Amino acid sequence: MADRCWIVIPAAGSGSRFGSEVPKQYHLLKNKMVIDRTLSVFLNWEPTYKVVVALSPDDDRFEQTALGSHKDVIRVMGGAERADSVRKALEYVCEYALPSDKVMVHDAARPLLQAQDLDRLWGVRALTSAIFARPIADTLKRSQDGTIQETVSRDNLWGAQTPQMANPNALLRALQTCCDKGISVTDEASALEALGERVSIVEGPAYNIKITRADDLLIASALLEMLE
């Protein structure tokens, strides 16, 4: 049997920084919803077994998506924070996962990934947990009250992306332990790091942007034209 990959997509957030009553994943990107573009790349990628989407309890939009009723898409109730949503989705995954299975956790609002990108991350699955990330290019400043306090060296600094890949049981244990100990985690890798797990970096594509603010849709649209 070929190795299987579960996909977890936390989509319970309100997207307050986007500045719209409609969560960012439900906005249109060139005539398709952002989340449909995100789902599509995974549903058409051969190693994908199932896609588990964590939704807000009051989400009434997902059922209107083109791919929300796909036979390989499973809905679970999300939590208040991203880590809570991922943990709830992983509880489902771990109930059915095989020992050799992996999981990739991916932002609903990163719709531009290509199958060949997933292949590169999948290629290191036997060795380690791994994430996509990009080297920091901008000069970094630490500020207080709108004033620069210091310039921070960007040596060895990377900006984390998704997907982030791990063994589903190991990731669930890491997230649960961090929750129990009150350790704040901002992505899956930080939970694994907190437990001393080794997480490798695979350089992600520059176009793997996260739609966070309204003008990101314009950037994503331009990038999509390039990719098509």
Predicted regions and their residues:
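N-terminal glycine-rich phosphate-binding loop and ensuing alpha1 helix
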Residues: 2-60
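Conserved core of the sugar-phosphate nucleotidyltransferase
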Residues: 113-202
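Acidic helix N-cap motif at the loop->helix transition within catalytic regions
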Residues: 60-66
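Conserved beta-strand scaffold positions in the cores of enzyme catalytic domains, especially
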Residues: 26, 75, 129-130, 199-201, ...
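Short phosphate-binding loop-to-helix
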Residues: 67-101
